Regions:
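Conserved, structured core segments of small domains
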Residues: 1-118
Length: 118
């Protein structure tokens, strides 16, 4: 089964770290990804930029398009990154989420991938 681990962070959290702290945190996440890859569980992982490059696109029934540029100050959490995993069970995905270094400063949301009609 394929699972996404979404790293949900408070907006602006990264800017509270010193440069050294940011490098240390990022290094721990890279090591975690490399270990998952070594175990044959990781398809891809990536951190996401937040802020001025964000955008939301909405297409309405009348084909009108609305594009809203970020940052989105009204949000309570931002997706700071993700891991796409192949796991035997949901329990395995949850165990991996508990191992994730980001669980110490963010929320890790575990979502199984599948068709949207199921």
């Amino acid at each position: 089964m394929t699972y996404a681990l979404l790293v949900l962070e408070p907006p602006g959290q990264r800017s509270t770290r010193t440069e050294a702290e940011g490098h240390e945190v990022y290094g721990r996440m890279v090591q975690f990804s490399e270990e998952l890859k070594r175990r044959g569980l990781l398809t891809i992982s990536q951190s996401l930029k937040t802020g001025s490059t964000d955008a939301r696109v909405k297409v309405r029934a009348d084909s009108s398009v609305m594009i809203t540029d970020g940052p989105f100050t009204e949000v309570k959490e931002v997706i700071g990154g993700f891991f796409l995993l192949t796991c035997e069970t949901r329990e395995q995905a949850l165990a991996i989420a508990r191992e994730c270094p980001a669980a110490q400063w963010a929320t890790i949301e575990v979502r199984e991938l599948g068709p949207c009609f199921a």
